[in-house]
Amino acid sequence: MTHLFALSAAAADIMNISLRSRLSAARLTYIDSLHGTSRQQSFTASLLLDEAIRLCCPSVPRPLDIAANENGKPYLTAAPDVHFSLSHSAAWAVCAVSDHPVGVDIQQCRSFKPNIADRFFHPDEVQYLSSLSPADRENAFYTLWALKESYVKADGRGLRLLRQFCVDIACQPPAITVGAPGSLFVPDFPDPAYKLGVCVQEEHSEAPALTVLQHLSTP
């Protein structure tokens, strides 16, 4: 089963000592090495992961100890069979927790970027985008981008995969037409300026419900 959570950066005060105490010393050192919005986004995402694991897997020791495999994909050292994925964009962080490899991505919708599509999308996806009206193309571009990023995160082998698989968003739910099988979802997001994509490496997986956290629990 896959669980999906979202948290606004406004709910994560980086100077709040109580919130900082939820994270490991190593994680805080990394966060404090960042600057500006990157620092706040990383702090928000880290707190969201802590809260998501607390809710879904309360037996996992906290603060969470996170390592990375040979491809750089993060995992929980105390619970390697608990799969998770994080993403953040501007004002939001999202987290997926699953019993299967999972990827999640959130994108703030701005303008269509044909150079990104031409460089990173499968030729069939580029052709599909070119067939759309300008009004529909922007929405489709960010939907595809979020889904492709989520697929790459679930796989864990990096961005080199982006052109090696193809996603069909004309069907519901979206389908992987070229590449390893899995389940794709585009959950409704409360902020219309963002697109959310989820990939679970399990065929016919149940669609995850999104929980938007209004606040964080007391440590």
Regions found by a protein language model. Give the residues of each.
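Core catalytic alpha/beta fold that binds nucleotide/phospho-ligands
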Residues: 1-219
